[in-house]
Amino acid sequence: MLLLASASPARRRLLEQAAIPHRVRVSGVDESTIHDQDPRALVQKLAFAKASAVQSCLDPSVDGGITAVLGCDSVFVFEGEVFGKPADAKEAIDRWQRMAGGSGELLTGHCLVADGLGATMACVSTVVQFAALRLGEIEAYVASGEPLNCAGGFALEGRGGLLIRGLNGCYSNVIGLSLPWLRTALEDHCAG
């Protein structure tokens, strides 16, 4: 069984929809203490920290049946700037005014940690193309509250999906977990 080291409801839903048996345990990692200039390296470091923190606390009497721990972290890169979750509505509106009509890259770091097999890590990238939007559309979306809880300030699987013109890459990666990557990593884990 997989243990998801994440508080993300979207990641949990992806695993449920894919019928992957799992449990959830939040890592408690202070993300503000982990830095890297390269956003690809940053998301992988964060994913590793989350998976490792949870894996190091496994108790066989409670966690029997856990064969691997999965950590993930996502950031959005627009015009060379890394966007995590917006701090507030004003920041979300400002970002959306910049992003409207443009495109950026959603990066998700993945780390699967398994006893005896070490860690399997990757950064999966998806290009997100945004529709041209009027200020009123942006304000209405931000007022919904949805963009305040997502890397980059948008949720593809929610209202934000209406504001996206297209994707180049993995759909589920934009939601926070690349299911194709996970399938391959789990297959490799089982073969190991």
Curated annotation (Swiss-Prot):
Q: Give the catalysed reaction(s), semicolon-separated.
A: a ribonucleoside 5'-triphosphate + H2O = a ribonucleoside 5'-phosphate + diphosphate + H(+); a 2'-deoxyribonucleoside 5'-triphosphate + H2O = a 2'-deoxyribonucleoside 5'-phosphate + diphosphate + H(+)
Q: What would you give as a GO molecular function for this chain, any one?
A: nucleoside triphosphate diphosphatase activity
Spell out the subcellular localization from the entry: Cytoplasm
Q: Which keywords, in A-to-Z order, does the entry hold?
A: Cytoplasm, Hydrolase, Nucleotide metabolism
Q: Which SUPFAM superfamilies match?
A: ITPase-like (SSF52972)
Q: Which GO terms describe its cellular component?
A: cytoplasm
Homology family:
Belongs to the Maf family.
Which protein are we looking at? Nucleoside triphosphate pyrophosphatase
Q: Could you tell me which species this protein originates from?
A: Synechococcus sp. (strain CC9902)
